[in-house]
Amino acid sequence: MVEAGGVEGALRAARDAKAAGADLVEFRVDPLCEALVGSGVGESAFVEVGHLCGSSVLPCVLTCRVEEEGGAYSGDDVWRGELYGRLLGSETPPRYVDVEVSAWERSAALRERVGGSLGECGLILSAHDFSGVPASLFRDMERMRRHGEAAVLKVAFRA
């Protein structure tokens, strides 16, 4: 995972990852988006993240993780849907976008903006539990699988 606290630093890290044999890189843009949206310059986040995806030497997973699931982004799902939707419609979209299944289920705006724009991009639906192995792990996976749009199902937990 490459954290996108600074776009040029993230791009350097992606080049280093490629040189080490990686074929895919994850850009965690939630710290960047939180800082820019929180400062009232959310439009700059669209530009910066677009530059990140467009300049990466590797296909990327784009993640703007919400606070409830271990990320830094505290804004709304409508803005994240707009971010993902704009990038999915660009000339250099990410290979995957990672969206929390809880957000996917609660936000019609996120589903409409992302689900209708996927094209060649794959959707990763994810769930995170940092307290341990979820007792409902298999039910959660089944619930996630019902969302036919997902190319990848991801569950992260502390073992």
Predicted regions and their residues:
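Alpha/beta enzyme core
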Residues: E8-L24, R80-R95, M141-E149
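Charged helix-capping and loop-helix junction motifs
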Residues: S39-E48, D77-G81, L137-M141
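Short acidic, S/G/P-rich loop/turn micro-motifs used as interaction or catalytic elements
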Residues: G5-V7, P31-L36, E67-G70, S102-R106, ...
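Catalytic alpha/beta core domains of metabolic enzymes, predominantly
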Residues: S102-A159
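Structural preference for beta-strand elements that scaffold enzyme active sites
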Residues: L24-E26, P59-T63, P94-D98, E120-S126, ...
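Glycine/small-residue-rich loop that forms an oxyanion/phosphate-binding "nest" at active or ligand-binding sites
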Residues: C53, P59-R106
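Active-site mouth loops of central-metabolism enzymes
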Residues: M1-L11, V66-W79, S126-A135
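Glycine-rich, proline-tolerant flexible connector loops at the mouths of alpha/beta enzymes
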Residues: L24-C53
